[in-house]
Amino acid sequence: MNLIILNLYYLVILFSIIGYGYFLSNILKLYINVKEIVIFGILGIIFLTFISYLTNIFSPHGFVHNIIIHSIGIILFLSAVKSEVIIKKKIYVIAILSIIIVCFSLLSKTHDDFGWYHLPYTLNLSQNKFQYGLGHFNHGFRTPSSLFYLNSLFYLPGIKFYSFNFAQLYIFQFSLIYFYKKIFNKENNNSFEIFYSLLAFIFISVVFYRLAEHGTDRSGQTLLFIVIVLILNILSKNLVETKKINLIILLLVYLITIKTYFIIFILLMLPILMFIKKDYLIYKKIFFSKTIAFSILFLFLHFHIQLANSGCLLYP
């Protein structure tokens, strides 16, 4: 695969992801700061996965389908840039970092499970619409990850299945930028949050830098670090921010779709629940928000896929 073509596709899809993140933040009224382009990126990953779950019921994720999806994403991205929601200077920085990450990713092999079931499952999504009973063909098909569905949207002419690790790279990239900003943010006076972000940045850089380490678990663990930072931020400010709580809920839901065992980390919400205590107005704002409605629908689609593949709602 030509390196220039690979980088061009990576950048185009990256901008599409950010565009969808901007769109989702508006729908859910999350009011993301213009400086938080990384959050737009993470939200874009979540929304594109949701779209992938939904559209695969009716259609395979072939070239035409994916070109339409990313054309809309680019339009959304350009509208965000035009309205100055996204700062142009940050785009250049992310673009340069993207090229570096793509080049370095080629130095290592793919994950050991990639050829076993990651590639076949994702390729099947690109060639066929939703099917029941896939778990009978391959043991790995019984544990579908949302990352396979996200990667299936990157099946495009000229690159084909060479993009089937892009999802992991985007999560890796957004996480590094997120923690880097937390470490060097002059407005952040929380030393514990800065120290934790530094440890997370070093850990991800050292342990997860090779593509061979990125199956599905590593991406979930990376996002889990972000969830913990958001929780620390809420608790340290001694201020309930429903926007951040909604963001935490979205991330926890997405973690469950990556690997079902991440469901145990819902317990991380306990400190926030203890912090809110009996403030029923805040509970009402959270439980009757668009975020909860979106999350319920997202989980319904995920467990429907899980049931269709393995016959179990929770597997293994």
Which residues does each predicted region cover?
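Membrane-embedded, hydrophobic transmembrane alpha-helices
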Residues: M1-I87
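Transmembrane-helix signature of polytopic, membrane-embedded enzymes
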Residues: Y31-F40, F179-S205
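Membrane-interface alpha helices of multi-pass inner-membrane proteins
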Residues: Y53-N56, F208, K244-T260, I264-P271, ...
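Perimembrane helix-loop-helix junctions
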Residues: F77, V81-I86, F265-I296
